[in-house]
Amino acid sequence: MIIGPALTLAALIVMAIAAPWLGTVDPGALDPAARLRDLSPEHWFGTDLLGRDLYSRVIYGARVSLIVGFTVALLASAFGILIGVISGFSRWLDPVIMRIMDGMMAIPSILLAIALVALTGASMRNVIFAITLAEVPRVARLVRSVVLSIREEPYIDAAIIGGAGPIRIIWKHVLPNTVAPVTVQATYICASAMIAESILSFIGAGLPPTVPSWGNIIAEGRMVWQIKPTLIFFPALFLSINILAINMLGDGLREALDPRLPKER
């Protein structure tokens, strides 16, 4: 179950990296005389309202989506692990940290991201920051549960008796046990971040309109979707394939890394 999604995701990553060579023209090049062109050898996906080549914009959109998704997954995992470990080992900080995490999780992540972007402004950095902050509680609670499950294990007591300090215990016994669940969770966060970025851009609260993100392309195409449905179809198709591949990869990793799940024969 992992191979297919992994190959699909690898193809999208290659496409994003090779966007300058795969794109037929500059994704931001305007040509008013060529606006709303149909599919042709010159414009494989046609052109948009401003005469920009849709194929090139969709290709570059993969780069934007993957950068946001991977960066948010990495940052949310790092900060979530740190907060989760501190909460799991500190009996007096744990209630405070968990109430903060519960409060953040009580707010829908997309609404929290919209509020943060509205306060900080629309840019790639601010969008990544806003989505990361909304996703950190998911990792923090997961890591805390792992820490609580192993904190009372006999080998932890043996390590303490043997003179191991907190840092050594965390590094040698706690962090290795968080790798599998956090890796799986990171794939879901990556997909969630891509969807959040697309939603933010679609409603005008995300990346600037000049950035060729899939959300921006869909937002621009919705005005003429009845006469030019391809302006929405192609970016939505690539976004759907991307999200589906990452979620299926996460499911495959969960089945492979979680010994409690029954294995497929």
Give the residues covered by each predicted segment.
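Transmembrane-helix boundary motif in ABC transporter permease subunits
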Residues: 19-22, 68-102, 114
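Glycine-rich helix-loop "coupling/hinge" segments at transmembrane-helix boundaries
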Residues: 105, 116-121, 131, 146-147, ...
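C-terminal transmembrane helix and the adjacent membrane-cytosol boundary/short C-terminal tail
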Residues: 133-134, 180, 184-190, 229-265
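N-terminal signal-anchor/first transmembrane alpha helix
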Residues: 1-28, 100, 179
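Generic hydrophobic transmembrane alpha-helix motif, especially the helices
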Residues: 44, 48, 88-89, 93-150, ...
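Hydrophobic alpha-helical transmembrane segments of membrane transport/permease proteins
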Residues: 15-50, 203-211
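Amphipathic cytosolic juxtamembrane alpha-helices at the membrane-cytosol interface
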Residues: 52-67, 71, 91-98, 148-152, ...
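Loop-to-helix entry region at the N-terminal start of transmembrane alpha-helices
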Residues: 55-69, 118-138, 230-239
